[in-house]
Amino acid sequence: ELNADQETKYFTLIEKRGQRIPLQHLTGVQEFMGFPFLVNEHVLIPRQDTEILVEEALSVLKKEKGTVTLLDMCTGSGCILLSILKLTQRECGCDFIYGTGADLSEQALEVAGKNAAILGTEAVFCRSDLFERIDGRFSMIVSNPPYIRTGEIGTLQEEVRAHDPLMALDGGADGLDFYRRIIRESTEHLLPKGYLMLEIGYDQAQAVGEWMREAGFQRISVKKDLAGLDRVVSGVYDG
């Protein structure tokens, strides 16, 4: 039985959910890869589809030896980076993995830092407009950048268009603005035989794969999600 305060809180939450405020914003938590992640209005709520990107990264890291350096571009809540770091501790063959998460949003980086502390995972977080303030080269770069076409944002579910941060959704007129930059600039930040892995929209694999090919990436592959839609494009840079 609820006391008066609990009852008031309960009906307040019901009212807010009726206003299409995401459940994750009401609870402040979303599970991803089996881990709890803090979320708020400053970060994209982690989606199950994005777990495909983490699984693809882990499938490569299982075969790596020595020290691995990992960059998560557009890190948001840090769910991709921190899940990979956490799971490599028990699943992968590398001796040690250093993780860096980059995002333009200071508020998002605050959330990512809190999530790292909760999970007991060490990572460096950097405020950067893509690679602008990123130094050094990495064994792997992963990213789930904004990829919704500007003109389509108004058609999204209210929970998404009104409550996920616009800067985490808007990929420009064709949804591909961030891929152009990430692919072009990543070649200056990958070690030889380094991997680039990108989450994509269902109809973006051809364009993204072709740009990676033109930039010098090889062994380009496309991974589908559970719905059978193209979800992750990856490639190896031999530069």
Q: Where are each of the predicted segments found?
A:
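Conserved Class I SAM-dependent methyltransferase catalytic core
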Residues: A173-Y237
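Class I S-adenosylmethionine-dependent transferase superfamily signal
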Residues: A57, I84, V160, I182-S186
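Mobile active-site "lid"/loop adjacent to the S-adenosyl-L-methionine
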Residues: Y147-D177
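Conserved AdoMet
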Residues: E1-V60
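C-terminal beta-strand of the catalytic ATP-binding
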Residues: P145-Y147, V236-G239
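Conserved SAM/SAH cofactor-binding pocket of Class I
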Residues: I52-T155
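Short loop/edge segments at beta-strand edges and connector loops
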Residues: T27, C126-S128, I200, K224
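Conserved beta-strand segments of alpha/beta enzyme cores
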Residues: P36, Y98, E122-V124, Q218-S221
